[in-house]
Amino acid sequence: MTATVLLEVPFSARGDRIPDAVAELRTREPIRKVRTITGAEAWLVSSYALCTQVLEDRRFSMKETAAAGAPRLNALTVPPEVVNNMGNIADAGLRKAVMKAITPKAPGLEQFLRDTANSLLDNLITEGAPADLRNDFADPLATALHCKVLGIPQEDGPKLFRSLSIAFMSSADPIPAAKINWDRDIEYMAGILENPNITTGLMGELSRLRKDPAYSHVSDELFATIGVTFFGAGVISTGSFLTTALISLIQRPQLRNLLHEKPELIPAGVEELLRINLSFADGLPRLATADIQVGDVLVRKGELVLVLLEGANFDPEHFPNPGSIELDRPNPTSHLAFGRGQHFCPGSALGRRHAQIGIEALLKKMPGVDLAVPIDQLVWRTRFQRRIPERLPVLW
């Protein structure tokens, strides 16, 4: 008897086209055993129905994926307890304060985003084409936004950003540099909490709560961790999404022209760009804490399950004509780009506004934006938790 050869994930590092294997799996085997880069076996779910089942069932735990001996999607780049960061925040009684601080409705925040986007684009126009929309627009805009929301100096953003190229690696083996960067960034945020000049944003609020006797049970480590994780996860998610959204938009000149002519349609456009977004390179990992029936498979306690977002978001059973961007879908926000259930992304509203304002500013300044190289010449980062091109060269 020959052993079954397991499919290896991820299928592709490219964020501009969905692998053919996704549709085939969703049709034939919406739950299928695969092998991760660590050599561990996992169940890959690829239909909308099964993906939502796993994300909404609390017996599939994100926290337990970091447990000692658990099958791994990839090596941890943060301390194990940080995997359950939002759970730790809620347990400490800090969720309300954090959510209030990261709303895009904070006074002056949207104008700050517009001003920053316009300034970045003006610099690119002054320098002339070709311009790099990832390194000189999407990522700096995301970095500036999160410095503003955190209430930390803008000049500190690039230093913190440099940690992310290692923090979000997808490696089979431990990454020594990740701990070095983590310890340095924690030390930075601890210093921010002690800085009397930091009075605004999330860190200003955490600094006040840290001195409140009602929060004496919360460790300084957790207060600092909130700052580090919010910056890291927020910047990498918003920056990579805007980058891949711009690629999708450039590939669809009719949509680009429509959103330029009718900017009021940009929110609907962003929702569809979120749905077809391929920036999340690996399936969302969950560990079964009980035996659970998923489709035709009984997932056993202790087994790893991977939720394939592009499988769900391109499922024609839920989104007819899934490869087409349709601004009048009846269920526009039911995609899983921000997850689902207890780990739904807390920064979803902020991420939407970042993309909406960034795209609106770009189309005003560069209405004819186009790739400056053939799309197959884009170099996609490999072994990374996000699908991003190293550069996004454009002309206009």
Swiss-Prot record:
Record key words, sorted: Cytoplasm, Heme, Iron, Metal-binding, Monooxygenase, Oxidoreductase
Activity regulation behaviour: Inhibited by clotrimazole, econazole, ketoconazole, and miconazole.
GO MF entry, a single one: oxidoreductase activity
Xref: SUPFAM superfamilies: Cytochrome P450 (SSF48264)
Catalyzed reactions: cyclo(L-tyrosyl-L-tyrosyl) + 2 reduced [2Fe-2S]-[ferredoxin] + O2 + 2 H(+) = mycoclysin + 2 oxidized [2Fe-2S]-[ferredoxin] + 2 H2O
Sites annotated Participates in a stacking interactions with the tyrosyl of cYY: 168, 182
Entry superkingdom: Bacteria
EC number assigned by the record: 1.14.19.70
Keyword Transport: no
Compartments it resides in: Cytoplasm
PROSITE patterns: CYTOCHROME_P450
Main localization, broad class: cytoplasm
Phenotype for residue 237 to A: Has little effect on the heme conformation but significantly alters the environment of the heme and the affinity for azoles
UniProt: heme binding residues: 286, 343, 345
Cofactor(s) listed: heme
UniProt-annotated site: Important for the position of heme, residues: 346
InterPro entries: Cyt_P450, Cyt_P450_B, Cyt_P450_CS, Cyt_P450_sf
Positions with a binding annotation for substrate: 77, 85-86, 237, 301, 385
Gene Ontology cellular-component terms listed: cytoplasm
Similarity-based family: Belongs to the cytochrome P450 family.
Misc: Was identified as a high-confidence drug target.
Role according to the record: Catalyzes C-C bond formation between the carbons ortho to the phenolic hydroxyl of cyclo(L-tyr-L-tyr) (cYY) producing mycocyclosin. Can also use cyclo(L-Tyr-L-Phe) (cYF), cyclo(L-Tyr-L-Trp) (cYW) and cyclo(L-Tyr-L-3,4-dihydroxyphenylalanine) (cY-DOPA) as substrate.
Protein name: Mycocyclosin synthase
Gene source species: Mycobacterium tuberculosis (strain ATCC 25618 / H37Rv)
Primary gene name: cyp121
